[in-house]
Amino acid sequence: MIKVFLLIIGGAIGSALRFGVSTWMQRSMLYSFPFGILSVNVIGSFLIGFCWSIAEAYNFSINTRAFLFTGLFGGFTTFSSFALDTMVLMRTGEYKMALLNVLASNILGLIAVFLGIILGKNIITMIK
């Protein structure tokens, strides 16, 4: 039961953070491109990679992992918003922007996870 509670709390925090970061990023840009969702997905990918490397090194409990990876980062990043933004771009005839969104989200997300893992491992090496 505690794991479910941690998932709910983590998801609520992640969702609130996603709303704030996404809204702020989108307002900062003057283009129709969905920078808000792209930014939370890239930031979240980096953070999940970073936290995963720390969780592996320090054997985080199943409850802590549930809070972080399923709750917090699951609430912060979102595939459904990415898909909706892409479909809206396609429906309005902005096919190049839609393709750019798909490529940027996937490529930058993978790079961000990779960099997060490397940073986490380097920090752990420095600490030990």
From Swiss-Prot:
Any one cellular-component term (Gene Ontology): plasma membrane
Membrane in keyword set: yes
Organism: Parabacteroides distasonis (strain ATCC 8503 / DSM 20701 / CIP 104284 / JCM 5825 / NCTC 11152)
Catalytic activity of the protein: fluoride(in) = fluoride(out)
Membrane topology recorded in Swiss-Prot or TrEMBL: Multi-pass membrane protein
Spans traversing the lipid bilayer: 4-24, 35-55, 67-87, 99-119
Superkingdom assignment: Bacteria
Function: Fluoride-specific ion channel. Important for reducing fluoride concentration in the cell, thus reducing its toxicity.
Regulation: Na(+) is not transported, but it plays an essential structural role and its presence is essential for fluoride channel function.
Gene: fluC
Ligand binding (Na(+)): G74, T77
Principal cellular location given in the protein's record: membrane
Localization in the cell: Cell inner membrane
Name of this protein: Fluoride-specific ion channel FluC
A GO MF label: fluoride channel activity
Protein's GO biological process: cellular detoxification of fluoride
Protein keywords: Cell inner membrane, Cell membrane, Ion channel, Ion transport, Membrane, Metal-binding, Sodium, Transmembrane, Transmembrane helix, Transport
Family designation: Belongs to the fluoride channel Fluc/FEX (TC 1.A.43) family.
